[in-house]
Amino acid sequence: MPRSNRNDNFIDKSFTVMADLIVKLLPINARAKEAYVYYRDGLSAQNDGDYAEALENYEESLKLEENPIDRGETLKNMAIIYMSNGEEDRALATYQKALDENPKQPSCLKNMGLIFEKRGRTAEEEGRRDDADGWFDQAAEVWTQAVRLNPGGYLDIENWLKSTGRSNVDVYF
């Protein structure tokens, strides 16, 4: 039974019914519809904290989905799971795949920067200043791209870029 048929929450059930109706009415092929069902079930599992099931559904969705924007969104969600599980290298690789599919995903860049910045802080705490600077520079690089894609959307990142002297003036205009 698809996960979408097991929702206990009234709002989730209502959303699922509406989404199913919209998908049935849209002029898209059966493969894309099936990919969406897997994606939706993956999202539901992810929201419930069932990451293994979410990843299984996302993998199935990727096998069927041809639209690069939708593939990018699916990959981004997978990367979020890897990141929350502490699989930083896998998360970074998956965020990059998501950006390869759809380069206009500032949240992927933001999250990549979070990993780089965390690694920089760890290196700094361990007294590895050169390594820390390298990680911070990588964070600045991806965060600058994120801010360019979403000006004003990441004020905390803009402040970090300014306070660390890693900002580019053109980012903010």
UniProtKB/Swiss-Prot annotation:
Compartments where located: Cellular thylakoid membrane
Gene3D superfamilies from the UniProt entry: Tetratricopeptide repeat domain
TPR repeat residue numbers: 35-68, 72-105, 120-153
InterPro entries cross-referenced by the UniProt entry: PSI_Ycf3_assembly, TPR-like_helical_dom_sf, TPR_rpt, Ycf3/AcsC/BcsC/TPR_MFPF
UniProt KW keywords: Membrane, Photosynthesis, Repeat, Thylakoid, TPR repeat
Membrane topology: Peripheral membrane protein
Keyword check for Membrane: yes
One Gene Ontology cellular component: plasma membrane-derived thylakoid membrane
One matching Pfam family: TPR_19
Listed SMART domains: TPR
One of the protein's GO biological processes: photosynthesis
HAMAP family to which the protein is assigned, alphabetical: Ycf3 (MF_00439)
Protein's job: Essential for the assembly of the photosystem I (PSI) complex. May act as a chaperone-like factor to guide the assembly of the PSI subunits.
UniProt-recorded name of the protein: Photosystem I assembly protein Ycf3
Provenance organism: Synechococcus sp. (strain WH7803)
